[in-house]
Amino acid sequence: RKPIMNARRWLSFLGIAALALSTGAAAAQAEGKPATARATFAGGCFWCVEEAYDKVPGVLATTSGYMGGKVKDPTYEQVTTGRTGHAEVVQVEYDPAKVSYAKLVEGFWRNIDPTQKDGQFCDYGPQYRSAIFYHDDEQKRAAEASRVALQKTKPFKGEIVTEITQASQFYAAEGYHQDYHVKNPARYKFYKSGCGRDARLQQLWGKAGG
């Protein structure tokens, strides 16, 4: 009987814990604090940006896609022409209780070359431009404040040319682009190394890069 009683107590504990978690989530929503939030960043090849955010505690999901242009439902082939207006982006779903938007922006800077216009590393064209796409006024203020602070403390001499612009319609990229660093690790490492991304980040940011 003792094992049965212990099991019952354990199940009772689990029930109470689950209730507490659901109550906490409901309370957070009642206070106007979303359980999840979105952030969107363009930092050149979306494979690399996706990998960077997949490592961040509090990030729930990342999706590679396109944003910033006027062409509806663009394909990768269309975007790579540089004529759609879209940039390769990664939309980040995160838990604001575990990671702040400001922290995500801070990580963004250290994974791009903010001095490079119309491209990132070995990839050139407006589709590879760097940009922060804000989803509300609070994100806009945080992004702009971060850029001002970086301008004063940056460890490099170049001018910061990264755009800060309002988010528009997000179009998810084709399935083979999603989680590319996980599905195709060898090809991904070959591309990233050949593109000189890590080397340039270290040159710009030192040990804080990447």
Task: Please give the residue ranges for each predicted region.
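Flexible coil/turn and secondary-structure edge motifs
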Residues: 6-7, 21-210
